[in-house]
A protein has these predicted regions:
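Short, extreme N-terminal segment that most often corresponds to the first beta-strand
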Residues: 2-35
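Short amphipathic beta-strand starts and helix->beta connectors
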Residues: 2-7, 44-51
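Broad gene-expression machinery/nucleic-acid interaction feature
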Residues: 17-21, 62, 93, 98
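A structural detector for beta-sheet-dominated domains
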Residues: 23-25, 57, 64-66, 99-104
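A short, terminal or domain-edge coil/loop segment
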Residues: 28, 48-51, 102-104
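Short amphipathic alpha-helix segments
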Residues: 29-48
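Short, intrinsically disordered low-complexity segments
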Residues: 48-82
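Charged interaction segments
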Residues: 69-104
């Protein structure tokens, strides 16, 4: 061993990343586009999610994000629900579903 070496080997490991896609149906059409923009802005402050996109496709909100901890999408689903409640003032009976979780 050379000076400064402790005799241990360190293995660098990369965390798995997940791309999660969620959809919220039942959003009133007149608030969908503004809601998508507001939710996107809300997620800009959540640095634990990367490559966030939130769009209104004319009938539903679609949220996509990547992170290294949410292998089943439930954490993002919970945060999406909170953001919808905070960003869309009009009450509605919507439904959030996990469309996909992909390991990157």
């Amino acid at each position: 061993m050379r000076a400064g070496e402790c005799g241990r080997k360190f293995v660098l490991c990369c965390s798995n990343m997940y791309r999660i896609v969620l959809v919220c149906r039942g959003v009133p059409p007149h608030v969908g586009a503004a809601g998508a923009r507001d939710i996107f802005e809300e997620f800009r402050h959540r640095s634990w999610h990367e490559n966030v996109k939130c769009v209104w496709d004319g009938s539903q909100l679609i949220l996509q994000a990547e992170n290294d901890f949410d292998s089943n999408g439930l954490a993002l689903l919970d945060e999406f629900s909170d953001s919808i409640s905070a960003c869309i003032e009009v009450g509605f009976d919507g439904d959030i579903q996990i469309l996909s979780v992909t390991s990157l």
